[in-house]
Amino acid sequence: MHKIVLLDKPRENPGELDWSPLQALGETTFYTHTEPEKAAARIGDAEIVLLNKTVLTAETLRQCKNLKLISVIATGYNTVDVDCCRELGITVCNVPSYGSEAISQNAIALLLELTNRVAHHDAEVRKGRSGGPGDWCFWDYSVMELEGKTAGIIGLGRIGKITARILRAFGMKILAHDMYQDPAWENESCRYTDLDTLYAPVSYTHLRAHETVL
């Protein structure tokens, strides 16, 4: 039987996830949260580690002599020193397509909040405010239409491309910056550019990249 350690559980609603398939694979220890300095002691002689946001440094990894696999329960794996893992022969895996549609949807929801101020006007109506006698509406902010405006997307990967498709459906033009350019996306409604050029004409910017890109 394998020895498995889950260093930090991703946020979940009570009873939402069934961990029994994981527990069936071996002796499993769960932690809700693990500070970086406690990681090595908690991993101990475990062969398999699962984590969400716990930081695993080279110093920590070198203390874990029996470690064979690190499974990141997320898309980003920048909290793990992958260069050190490669040196030590530790396999690192992640969930590359996790939540791509949901994250794009959330980005669009935030954008529409900026343009339409739905939350503000909802709160005002709940306070009892109305447009007044003879008027069926009111607004404290002008509605900003997205049609014809330009959006800047930094990081045109899985999430960035889904977001771009939605923005194009609104009639927006797309400027994108990415270290790895996809020729199939270079067209009249989307073009790649450098960061300085991207910032100049855009109305809205969507960031889908690690902090190191900037």
Segment roles from a protein language model:
Residues 1-46, 171, 175:
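N-terminal glycine-/charge-rich "phosphate-binding" loop or analogous flexible N-terminal tail
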Residues 32, 73-74, 91-101:
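Short beta->alpha connector loops at strand-helix junctions that form conserved
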Residues 88, 96-150, 165:
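Phosphate-binding beta-alpha-beta segment of Rossmann-like dinucleotide-binding domains, i.e.
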Residues 156:
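Glycine-rich Rossmann-fold phosphate-binding loop(s) that bind the pyrophosphate
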Residues 159:
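Hydrophobic/small residue at the entry helix of a nucleotide-binding pocket
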Residues 206-214:
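Single conserved hydrophobic/aromatic residue that forms the stacking wall/gate
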